[in-house]
Amino acid sequence: MKKSRGFALLAFALAVTTAVPAAANASPQPSAACKDVPNRYDLPFSVCDDELFIFAANYKPFESTVEDEQGAATRVFDEIVGNKLRETFPDVKIKYATWDYPVRYEDLKAAGVTPDIVIEDPKNRIDRDLEPMGWVGDLTPDLKKAGIDLNTLNKSAVELTKSRSDGGIYGVPLFIDEHVLLYNKKIFDKFKVKYPEPGMTYDEAFKKAKQLTADDGLHHYKGYMQHPDQYLDFNQAGLYPFLPTTSEEPAPEDVKVDISSDAWKTYVDNLYRFLEIPRNDFTTVTDFFKGDMSQPGHLAMAVDTLSRLNMYAGSELFIEDGDEAAFAEQAKSVDIGVSAIPVLERGATTTYQPNTRAAFIPPSSPKKEQALQIVKWLVSEEGQTELSSHGVKAVLQTDKVVQSFGKAIPELAEIDTSAVYWGENAAISNYQNTEYWDLPLWSVYRQHILRDGGTPEQALSLSQQQDIPNYIKAQSEAGKDW
């Protein structure tokens, strides 16, 4: 979607910090020292030493802008949790920024500015961005001192974050942009097919997909879309491609990978059959609304994220400014239903690995104690209720938090979202003495199956024997370890 970047970034120069005003009788304070951060947009940006700086990246809704906002890409963070956070900590001057609005990691590093809290994707970004910056370290003793109990949080999200940390844990999971099954009731009703329910197996989904890949006059409907890259990456079977070595940080040439086992073949076969349904060709999961299709509302089922659900439901908070009319028009062709993603076998309750965002506190943060208290609040029942009420899946799942889901998003009121917290996320295991590399698993489906026409067995073997070793070698030669 087109961003209102020019105006929004210009506005960013006018007001980038929000804080509760000091009391009228407060004693005069010395002027804070500020560091300017040059950036590719040549817009003024600075961080002062009396500000606690929160920087977020890789959560798409945070990038949403509006033309009349007093700041760039701050409105979603503020609405979801920022305003409540400032209300809770009136004596803390909180400055928030989203990546590329207008600064990036390398801009901050070059200016000698270290965020006090970084909200990031622990799955792929610890090795890629945070470790090279020197912005992560084991928080175990700090969390214990601050009274942050990870045992109360989503176990799979915690385990995922641990798996990317070289000993201990580098961050605290905050929320999950969960994958759910979206379905269009209009298409189900048209072809008289029963709606999906949580606990539906892939076998049952496959049967429905074939029934719903159908024609009605000049209209062709597709039955099912599930992005194959995400299917592998958020591995529902809990499969981990790396084999243990003798070190937590093995050299590139010592990294061992296995994606050709029977378990991997079975898992890849499971989705492969959906791709073989005649005229259910994979394009994009955003076809659920319109995506690449010529007309909206012609895809019966799609696995996508909660942030996409909020957008489809019509929440202006999650829709880019200027796109509201287009979404409203497309919405006329879709009656949204929400279920959990299909399970691998009858009676199972395991969904994808969590699409987590976590809070990281750089070791060199000058406000580490304050940052820990803010993170503690963010994972408290009060903080998690605030997130959940805005259509974001929380990592603390008390009755109050779960029941609050979507209450602050009026557009979700008529949609049954009870499936959001259904089941348990798949968990990573046996990751000790492995080094995570952002492997090109996309080559399995998108290259060797969809483009080359290969079988799952061929695709897995080629990826393991050629694509992955070539990737690791190229990255290593470029001085990268991800």
Question: Where in the sequence are the language-model features?
Answer:
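Hinge/lid segment of periplasmic solute-binding proteins
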Residues: 33-42, 122-178, 331-340
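Long, aromatic- and glycine/proline-rich binding clefts that accommodate carbohydrate-like moieties
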Residues: 38, 339, 389-450, 476-482
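A structural signal for short loop-to-beta-strand junctions that line the ligand-binding cleft
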Residues: 107-109, 115-116, 146-186, 220-222, ...
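Short helix-initiation/N-cap motifs at beta->coil->alpha
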Residues: 97-105, 200-206, 281-295
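Glycine-centered hinge/linker elements that transmit conformational signals in sensory
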Residues: 209, 252-285, 341
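Periplasmic solute-binding protein
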Residues: 130-134, 140, 155-196, 226-253, ...
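Conserved N-terminal structural module of periplasmic/extracytoplasmic solute-binding proteins
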Residues: 6-16, 20-132, 145-146, 195, ...
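Extracytoplasmic/periplasmic substrate-recognition and gating elements
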Residues: 320-393
